[in-house]
Regions:
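Charged, low-complexity surface segments at secondary-structure and domain boundaries
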Residues: 1-12, 38-44, 96-103, 191-200
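Hard-cation-handling environments
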Residues: 2-85
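Feature captures C-terminal
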Residues: 49, 53-228
Length: 228
């Protein structure tokens, strides 16, 4: 294992003092104990992670939505089973300049289009058309993704609560990190408030079930499924 070099370099006293000064007004909020995690909390997968699952689970619960989208970010602190989840950990997963939550009514066809568009950004065979590295995270929805399929045909077997997603039916979808100015001014609270509320309501213990992946046959096919 490589050493963590930051632990071997003495801190600059002036910078350390500045950091303490800047953090001081927020220490109580940052240090709030939300819950103890029963499992590993991480955010390193291309399709999902347990931090991502916590976020989408919270959006569904707090927004009374049928499914939820979360951006494919991969930063933040990983926590081991038994670690205390503090507000600072939640903020370092979600604190961006456009953290507002959204609720939209989308048809099954529109939901598939969103997933297909992101997939094409990731898996287009022409590298000049590849525009991102991570799939949008999804809560409440089960689907199969075949990266080697043609554009518009990578997402199949979409299911909500075990039933096939209806292309013509409208669903309530929660999300966050809207890029349009109009959406950011719609009045949605910062996303971290939702997982914080969910964690506080779990009586001090928090367990997050992370969907698994399948790799049948020779063609890579990932399965993203809701927790049992």
């Amino acid at each position: 294992l490589l050493p963590v070099f930051a632990n071997l370099i003495p801190a600059d006293p002036a910078m350390e003092a500045l950091i303490r000064k800047m953090r001081a007004p927020f220490e109580d909020k940052l240090g709030e104990k939300l819950a103890v995690t029963e499992g590993l909390l991480y955010r390193r997968g291309n399709f999902n992670g347990s931090w991502d699952q916590l976020i989408v689970d919270a959006l569904i619960a707090e927004k009374d939505a049928e499914l939820a989208f979360s951006p494919g970010f991969r930063w933040g602190t990983s926590l081991l089973p038994g670690d205390t989840i503090r507000m600072e950990h939640l903020l370092d997963q979600t604190a961006i300049t456009y953290p507002w939550t959204t609720v939209s009514m989308m048809t099954g066809e529109q939901i598939k289009t969103v997933l297909e568009d992101v997939c094409d950004n990731l898996f287009n065979p022409d590298p000049y058309y590849q525009q991102g590295g991570d799939m949008v995270r999804v809560g409440g929805l089960q689907y199969v993704c075949d990266p080697n399929a043609r554009m518009g045909a990578r997402i199949t077997d979409m299911r909500l609560a075990g039933k096939p997603l209806d292309a013509g039916k409208t669903y309530k979808v929660a999300g966050w990190a809207p890029v349009s100015e109009e959406a950011s001014k719609a009045g949605g609270e910062p996303v971290w408030e939702n997982p914080a509320a969910l964690a506080r309501g779990k009586g001090g213990r928090l367990a997050v079930a992370v969907p698994g992946y399948g790799l049948p046959g020779r063609q890579p096919r990932w399965v993203a499924a809701p927790p049992a």
